[in-house]
Amino acid sequence: CDTSSVSAEKGLIIRGKPLLDITHILPEEVFFLLLTGRLPNEAELSELNNEFSSYLNIPEYVWKVLSEMPNDAHPMTMFNTGILAMQGESIFRKRYDEGMPKTEFWEAILEDGIRLLAKLPALGAGIYRMRFDKGDRIEPDPQKDWSGNFVHMTGLPDDSGDFHKLMQLYFMLHCDHEGGNVSAFASHTVASALSDPYYSVCAGLNGLAGPLHGLANQECLKFVLSVRDKFNGLPTEK
């Protein structure tokens, strides 16, 4: 994989650009950078944003499926279920069944990827509000960027904009995992069978759910919160 690497001296490098040099760019720009090896110009970014904006909404049947899950279902299980429920929307699957030539496989895969990526913030935020009883879902705002929309749809206050900046950086840090870890390897393996992105992304999420992979983030947060509680709040700068 040549889309990203980790250097002992420079840290995370995405398509030849050190992370610290591109912390100001939008997730949509990172997506374009990963695919093409360069940052988009203004017209290309606008076109990509318009493409994303066309596919922000989650089909209602997905919410119905999720609403029937147990109240104590893990958000990752719900997230995975939501994506898999949308597999019938796959452009690749439909075109493959119609006899699409191999030379056009990449086009259908890319279309699936864009449509799925566009929906993930609404799915994740909607599951958060559903799972933790935060009220009705909040509709996406097509004027906001990918990370900004996620923050908006969680309903969490962000008057300072710090949460938006944090999510923007967090998404960038996790945008590409070289290919050697469990989730990336699982996704690549499933995709190699010409399973569409809905299937392959779900395979990666199943690996990500393990305590030696993505679930470690949750365990780490639990530890940090326990330390905070033990010392009665956040530490001072001293």
Predicted regions and their residues:
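Hydrophobic alpha-helical bundle cores within soluble ligand-binding/oligomerization subdomains
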Residues: C1-K238
